[in-house]
């Protein structure tokens, strides 16, 4: 079914509560594991319906944040979402404590039961008012960012539409664009500080209500980190500082030389070529058609997937003034349908949507064939391997998008992927500092960010910019506001995707087989087990990062 034809009606959560209560009673009355699993199938049907309708409403609001009807629906789900989470929790608690646990664990898998345990540790009914407040604060941030009106080049632009000017080949244009963006954030600095301060206090209060010292423990549970913790993440970040930061700085210096500059400035970030970054040559329609050709040639599985997405119009990718910033893939379980949301703006980022977000969507499409819904509850550190690796697997088709600048794109993509890892680790370490010290003032948080920038991105020079030069860059990173602690996942995944890059250059067919296997494993096993099973090294293992850097050196000679 096409997305626009999918019917929508507001979910009546009082009715859902009754239905969930009935399922819990049926679990109690069941006389065997088999009977409980039959009840569990009804739970799948109920949660599929709720999640599908909530997701439709949220997508339609994101597509047009000025739509009053879906704004009201979005607010309704922000209020009712935590109530629903609590109903799910009550059901899962009953399942978790089942006398037929051995049968159910064999049927659903040990990962699902570990995740249920983490869910019990991350939520309680007492948190509902705080979670509702948290939702309204993140919505306030989203609306503030989506509502940016920046006069530039004779047009009124939002932040997504300003992006091409930030990487323009003309340094003067870049400087003006960065100054305009800085002015927007400076003008809204007080509101941004207030929203974040309230979020930190709110999340800390949630953690303390659950008996934790600070939000980190609660945040790790909420991110479903079921086979690693803070110590492993810190060890990984240390490896990045020791081996990857020097490698990334080498790449930045190579970029500086290519740009013919004596010194890099912040206005040169993510600019890779003197004559500008490669941009797609076609219209949005031509980019989508090229994507279809590419996925038809890549494999039978990707061909079937992309044709399904196109036939059912499961993309909304054109940038518009009142559209939410950013891009994502989400899933509509009733229709076994992934959905991709993005903001095309004429840069190479448009093609990244067709590779990165389609990597997520392809895995979601494959996972839909698994009747055990819990197998789709993927940790983000695994989910991002699917998307980031697809960016590399599709490289040989880049001529369809970039013409004679395809090789420039491939070089830029590798450098950008490598340069991202220190930034991602910095975002993670910043959040660890913030949540370990919730008493920090907005100014102290910015000082912490500036210190981390010197450690992770020593080449960076803000030239005294009044906003970015004062440690404010993180305020444009929506994950920090909306999805706390969701960022190191990208770094862990990128280290795996870079391993796939090395593997596919040695033997593409074998690398693709390994990737397909990982996609199909979904969340049926723990992250650390799955990456081992498909022949990848764990980023947590000592020496993993050093080994990757040594193999990547050959690409930058």
How should these model regions be labeled?
Residues 242-243, 367, 378-407, 413-415, ...:
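Post-HExxH zinc-binding segment in Zn-dependent metallohydrolases
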Residues 255-274, 308-319, 379, 412-414, ...:
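A glycine-rich phosphate-binding loop feature that marks nucleotide/adenosyl-phosphate handling sites
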Residues 114-117, 227, 354, 362, ...:
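C-terminal, non-catalytic "cap/extension" segments appended to globular domains
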Residues 1-278, 290:
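A well-structured
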Residues 160-172, 280-355, 359-364, 466:
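Active-site-adjacent "gating/activation" loops or surface patches in catalytic cores
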Residues 127, 131, 185, 189-193, ...:
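Hydrophobic alpha-helical scaffolding
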Residues 359-373, 393:
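Catalytic Zn2+-binding segment of zinc metalloproteases
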